From Swiss-Prot:
Domain notes: Avian ovomucoid consists of three homologous, tandem Kazal family inhibitory domains.
Positions annotated as glycosylated: N43
CC annotations in GO: extracellular region
Protein name: Ovomucoid
Organism field: Geococcyx californianus (Greater roadrunner)
Domain of life: Eukaryota
Annotated disulfide bonds: C6-C36, C14-C33, C22-C54
Record has Nucleotidyltransferase as a keyword: no
Residue ranges of every copy of the Kazal-like domain listed in the record: 4-54
Localization (cell): Secreted
SMART domains: KAZAL
Length: 54
C-alpha cells in the first residue's frame, strides 16, 4: 500500500514542484505538500490512493 509521511505538514506555503499524487477522494494533488495539507484539513480521513494522477 502506498503511503506518504506527512509529519512535517501542514505548511503555510507549498512549492510549485509537480509530482502528482492521487488521494482517496479521487482527486489529484500536485505534490506531497498539497496532499499533506489536505490530509491535515481532513483530520486524517484522506489517504493516499496511489502515486501519479487519478
Amino acid at each position: 500500500i502506498a503511503s506518504v509521511n506527512c509529519s512535517d505538514y501542514p505548511k503555510p506555503v507549498c512549492s510549485l514542484l509537480y509530482m502528482p499524487l492521487c488521494g482517496s477522494d479521487n482527486k489529484t494533488y500536485g505534490n506531497k505538500c498539497n496532499f499533506c495539507n489536505a490530509v491535515a484539513d481532513s483530520n486524517g480521513t484522506l489517504t493516499l490512493s496511489h502515486f501519479g494522477k487519478c
